[in-house]
C-alpha cells in the first residue's frame, strides 16, 4: 500500500489484506537500514486474524521516498504523521532494534494515539563514531565497510 505523509510517498505492507482503519491497527517499525520485509510473517499472521497492519518503510528505506530522518525525535513524530495520514484512531506499535526507540518516542510524544508498545531486540541509544557519521552523511560507501568490519569482527 502506498500513501502520502508530509508530501512524500510511503510504502507499507498490509500483510496481504486490505487496510481498514476501523479495525484494531498495528504499525510495525523496522530497525536502521532495514525495511518492511523484517515483518513479513508477523504482518500476515495479524492481518488474517482481525487486525489492520502496516509494516512501514521509514523515509529513505525500502520503497518510501525522502531522505532518512536525522533523529529519533523526528522519526517518532513521523510515525504520528503516519497515524494521522491513515485515519487510525488508536494503534499498537511494534518496534525492532532502532524501531523500539522510534516507537517509544512516538508513544512519549503522542500518548493519546498509542494503545500499546511491543519492543523486540531494543537497546539504548549508542554513541556514534564521528568519522563514521561523517562518512555516512556524505554517502561514502566506506561507512558501510566500516560498519560491516565492526559487526563481523
Language model regions located:
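Helix-rich cap/lid subdomain of alpha/beta-hydrolase
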Residues: 118-153
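Active-site loop/oxyanion-hole signature of alpha/beta-hydrolase fold enzymes
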Residues: 3-15, 40-48, 52-98
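Short beta-strand element of the alpha/beta-hydrolase
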Residues: 22-31
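A general structural signal for well-ordered alpha-helical segments in protein cores
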Residues: 26, 76, 100, 129, ...
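Active-site glycine-rich loops that stabilize anionic/oxyanionic intermediates
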Residues: 31-34, 97
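Alpha/beta-hydrolase active-site loop signature
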Residues: 33, 58-62, 124
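Conserved hydrolase catalytic core segment
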Residues: 89-127
Amino acid at each position: 500500500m502506498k500513501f502520502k505523509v508530509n508530501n512524500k510517498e510511503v510504502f507499507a505492507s498490509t500483510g496481504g489484506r486490505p487496510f481498514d482503519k476501523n479495525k484494531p491497527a498495528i504499525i510495525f517499525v523496522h530497525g536502521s537500514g532495514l525495511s518492511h520485509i523484517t515483518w513479513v510473517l508477523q504482518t500476515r499472521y495479524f492481518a488474517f486474524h482481525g487486525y489492520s497492519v502496516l509494516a512501514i518503510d521509514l523515509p529513505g528505506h525500502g520503497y518510501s521516498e525522502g531522505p532518512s530522518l536525522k533523529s529519533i525525535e523526528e522519526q517518532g513524530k513521523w510515525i504520528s504523521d503516519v497515524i494521522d495520514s491513515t485515519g487510525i484512531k488508536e494503534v499498537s506499535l511494534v518496534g525492532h532494534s532502532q524501531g523500539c526507540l522510534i516507537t517509544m518516542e512516538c508513544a512519549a510524544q503522542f500518548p493519546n494515539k498509542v494503545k500499546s508498545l511491543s519492543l523486540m531486540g531494543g537497546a539504548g541509544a549508542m554513541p556514534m563514531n564521528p568519522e563514521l557519521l561523517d562518512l555516512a552523511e556524505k554517502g561514502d560507501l566506506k561507512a558501510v565497510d566500516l560498519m560491516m568490519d565492526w559487526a563481523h569482527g
